[in-house]
């Protein structure tokens, strides 16, 4: 008998208390800039500890690209409270610098002078550094300075037992459920870009003289008039190796099999570069992907890994643990880069994706229609009369958006039922207004501020970042919280030193071991 979305919602309603065990966490990126809004060329601040081993503050691509990481939380208020505290601690350490509160970068130095993140001399640290050298060779450093907010989300196993009762084991129920969620996310994530995309403009110099289709807003600012998120668009940058990847979200095994092919298949252009230059490692290998994380996507199935364990192997052996939503822009109007309203809507949206009917994708498991809808919304989502493709039928953004909000509303209500209050319903109601009035979207508000203030993207962003810094510094952390962050920083330095002193093999051998740790997730297909 077919299990319908209505039946799953009914079962979910009877077990709504399990929603109190939803876990969510945030990784928020932000460039360090100097007082003029220029990318900081300083080393990672000592007061923030070792980027390799500090669980609260690390770096992403560049030495200047901070990444602030929360733990997992069972409610949004405590989640954002921790993120706010981490920002406050960081601002207590930074001297003469700000966190750039925009997804599109600040003023960047010449490409060659953008500093790649450094993690010390341990094999673990060097692996991370060389991987980033490879990204520079493949995509350029400028693109790697784009920042975002990653939202990690998991439902308790007991809830997957309710939603996916026909799978044979808890691991199978969980993995099947998350992959089903990802298919629906792929179908409907255009809505997140319309509602929360905050990157319609950028600094002209970001394009580095490349050809583009952007328009001029002022001498130093480029934009698209109806764009929601240039960060999630191609921006005129095409990567042939990744553009041919069509990963399948119909089942975990096929997804992992195709990802395995990408991290083991040589790519001629990368073979021409090689892995060393002047005796120095410049990329980990010459394959389509150096490692799994190089694959760019708006959502990922995730599983915590052990040291030297490969993500493919962890997912194949222990299944999906949570999903990582990667398409959220930094909210420039919020000091922490994401609001409670946004987080609550994303919760309800993801629960809707997990529970709704999620048919398999045709065409070998890749949905070109969904990719096209996403691409058009990030470039012209607010364009009057814009039509999207829903199963072969043209539908307007407001019509489809309102219909989706109608479908998401019962899941927002379930979170309110479980947690008390009406905060989830209020978050959903705020999104309806954006569909009716595109001028209320973050992307429209950013462009309005630039036009009305007759100000460049750079000056507007620097002013906002300064004001957020002032607001955060005006609320210093309690002494015991400051002490806890400082102690974590000290311990991270000691842990990095321990790793450097405990390496038993040279780096070449370590890289070989790391590649050898990758297991074919579909051994029956191995030749």
Curated annotation (Swiss-Prot):
Any GO MF annotation of the entry: glutamate-cysteine ligase activity
Record GO cellular component, one term: cytosol
Disulfide-bonded cysteines: none
Pfam family, one: Glu_cys_ligase
EC number: 6.3.2.2
Domain of life: Bacteria
Catalytic activity: L-cysteine + L-glutamate + ATP = gamma-L-glutamyl-L-cysteine + ADP + phosphate + H(+)
An example Gene Ontology biological process: glutathione biosynthetic process
InterPro entries tied to this protein: Gln_synth/guanido_kin_cat_dom, Glu_cys_ligase, Glut_cys_ligase
Keywords assigned: ATP-binding, Glutathione biosynthesis, Ligase, Nucleotide-binding
UniProt pathway annotation: Sulfur metabolism; glutathione biosynthesis; glutathione from L-cysteine and L-glutamate: step 1/2
UniProt similarity note: Belongs to the glutamate--cysteine ligase type 1 family. Type 1 subfamily.
Protein name as annotated: Glutamate--cysteine ligase
Organism the protein comes from: Bordetella bronchiseptica (strain ATCC BAA-588 / NCTC 13252 / RB50)
């Amino acid at each position: 008998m077919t299990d319908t979305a209505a039946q799953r919602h009914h079962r979910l309603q009877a077990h709504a208390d399990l929603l109190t065990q939803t876990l969510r966490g945030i990784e928020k990126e932000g460039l360090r800039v100097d007082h003029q809004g220029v990318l900081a060329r300083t080393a990672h601040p000592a007061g923030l500890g070792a980027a390799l081993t500090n669980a609260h503050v690390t770096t992403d691509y560049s030495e200047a690209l901070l990444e602030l990481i929360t733990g997992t939380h069972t409610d949004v208020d405590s989640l954002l409270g921790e993120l706010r505290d981490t920002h406050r601690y960081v601002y207590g350490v930074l001297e003469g610098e700000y966190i750039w509160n925009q997804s599109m970068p600040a003023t960047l130095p010449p490409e060659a002078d953008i500093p790649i993140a450094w993690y010390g001399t341990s094999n673990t640290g060097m692996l991370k550094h060389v991987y980033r050298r490879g990204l520079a060779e493949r995509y350029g450093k400028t693109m790697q300075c784009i920042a975002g907010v990653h939202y990690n989300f998991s439902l308790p196993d007991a809830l997957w037992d309710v939603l996916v009762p026909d799978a044979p084991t808890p691991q199978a129920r969980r993995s099947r459920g998350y992959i089903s969620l990802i298919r629906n996310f792929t179908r409907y994530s255009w809505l997140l870009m319309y509602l929360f995309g905050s990157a319609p403009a950028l600094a002209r110099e970001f394009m580095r003289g490349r050809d583009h289709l952007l328009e001029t807003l002022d001498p130093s600012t480029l934009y698209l008039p109806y764009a929601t998120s240039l960060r999630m668009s191609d921006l005129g940058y095409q990567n042939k190796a990744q553009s041919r990847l069509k990963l399948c979200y119909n089942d975990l095994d096929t997804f992992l099999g195709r990802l395995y092919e990408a991290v083991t298949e040589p790519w001629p252009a990368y073979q021409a570069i090689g892995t060393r230059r002047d005796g120095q490692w410049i990329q980990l290998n010459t394959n389509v992907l150096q490692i799994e994380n190089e694959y760019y996507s708006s959502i990922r199935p995730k599983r915590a890994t052990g040291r030297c364990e490969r993500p493919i192997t962890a997912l194949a052996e222990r299944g999906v643990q949570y999903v990582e939503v990667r398409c959220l822009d930094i909210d420039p109007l919020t000091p922490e880069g994401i609001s409670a309203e946004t987080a609550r809507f994303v919760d309800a949206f993801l629960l809707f994706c997990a529970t709704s009917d999620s048919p398999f994708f045709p065409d070998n498991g890749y949905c070109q229609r969904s990719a096209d809808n996403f691409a058009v919304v990030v470039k012209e989502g607010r364009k009057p009369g814009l039509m999207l493709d829903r199963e072969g039928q043209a539908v307007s953004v407001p019509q489809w958006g309102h219909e989706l909000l109608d479908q998401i509303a019962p899941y927002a209500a379930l979170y309110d039922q479980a947690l008390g209050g009406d905060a989830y319903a209020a978050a959903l109601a705020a999104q309806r207004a954006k569909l009716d009035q595109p001028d209320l979207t973050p992307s429209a508000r950013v462009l309005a501020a630039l036009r009305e203030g007759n100000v460049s993207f750079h000056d507007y962003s620097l002013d906002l970042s300064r004001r957020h810094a002032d607001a955060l510094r005006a609320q210093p952390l309690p002494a015991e919280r400051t002490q806890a962050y400082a102690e974590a920083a000290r311990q991270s330095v000691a842990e990095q030193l321990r790793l450097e002193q405990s390496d038993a093999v040279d780096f070449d051998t370590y890289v070989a071991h790391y590649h050898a740790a990758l297991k074919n997730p579909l051994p029956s297909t191995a030749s």
